[in-house]
Amino acid sequence: MTLHKVQTHAEGQVLPRQDQLAWKIAELATSDRPMDAEAVIMVGNRLLDNAAVALGAINREPVRHARLLALGYAHPQQRGATLFGLPPELTFHCEWAALANGVAVRELDMHDCYLAADYSHPGDNIPAVLAAAQQRRCNGAALTRALLTSYEIQMALVTGICLHEHKIDHVAHLAPAVAAGVGTLLGLPTETVYQAVNQSVHLACATRQSRKGDITSWKAYAPGQAGKTALEAVGRVLLGECAPSPIYEGRDAVIAWMLSGPDVEYWVPLPDSTQPLRAILDSYTKQHSAEYQAQALIDIGFALHARGLDLDSVTDVLTRPSHHTHHVIGTGSNDPQKMDPDSSRETLDHSVMYILAVAWEDGAWHHVDSYTSERAHRPSTVSLWQKIRTEEASDWTQAYHATDFRNKKFGAEVVVTLSNGDQVIESLDNPNAHSLGASPFARADYIGKLRTMGDGVADPDEIDRFIGLVEDLERLSADDVARLNIVVPADRLQDTSAERVGIL
């Protein structure tokens, strides 16, 4: 692994292409290297995980609307990409399939994560890369290599370059990862991938208002849009077009004007040319449908529920988490919406105060029932909810940013004060399902998650067929990859036909 320095180049100088981060990303995407067996297994796990959460969200309004958008772009030769839930005989332009399937995967906020200098859901790469693989008739081995590239690039960028301190959304690291992954998928030249990466970054820098205040369904659309943008960038470059460069180091580029400025150095870790791509092994999924930093708080809520405390005797609940938890989903965000029962589902799944209150009261968590308006307005919940506050704890922030993965912690400590002055303390280093947690997710757990989320949505035989394809991922033919999708019976799937072509 080599740390690459990235900073704005000097005024009046030309930064050689080989010294630009986008070129180094492109070189990684176009290098031939061995595949790691554990990493390949994890690719399969991520496919299962994405399918699970997409099934669970298949008829939610944002997903239905995204599907309606894509339905207007059927592929004229019927050799495009599939839409999640629809038969493989129906294919659509890969860009629009990437959007629709990306929304389905992201909607429930329940798939994988990687948290470092910035935040990410690297599973967001999968819908776009898979759509490109289906349209270009790629086999399972090519798809696997491509996804390993996408994970490596996004997670390297998230490790080295913080976006959120400048209120830039993390999809700015997703789009170049998709472009690089598609470069690997199609065996494109380094020059082509370089141009596509530059174009993707140029178009994907959006603000974090999508995750602040009144959070809407755009939180689910944002990664799908980034994937669509990246595929369009690759397509444009394949026609011979070029892109703004150097997109990271230029005097008027991202670092100079959107991030920390021309005098700051970033360090991005990329594996050497002979090393296998293993970053995916440092990603981790969610057991519960909520922002990742709330996962451990849900598990803590279960532990508090088991104590059987009299909730009426609770006077104060101090949650001591990391900087991220406090400022993004805690009271440090200064978002009154996070304390409001009338807030959107997208806002509530980013409110650790609400999440802890519900998990504590119920001793359970459900991706739908835990967010209903009735649930949010329960008087006992509102009372407990308003007593919960967060306060950044430096030890948790330090553990969050630990450079050694084995020392990372994404948990918190909760101090409950009772009316008699007694205190009850619950602490958890990592969510139970985390690879460092009490019960790390393995292949059987991902399959179980898929069966649970798909219950009553897809037929068990269809889920078994999909699992069988994933189990044989590296050996899948192009025809198999074209069917790497779960079909939902027509009577269980809403909004499956479009009366229009185009957005309006």
Where are these regions (language model features)?
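Hydrophobic alpha-helical hairpins/lids featuring a short glycine-rich hinge
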Residues: 101-157
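Glycine-rich, mobile lid/loop segments that gate access to catalytic sites or pores
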Residues: 133-228, 232, 246-247, 251
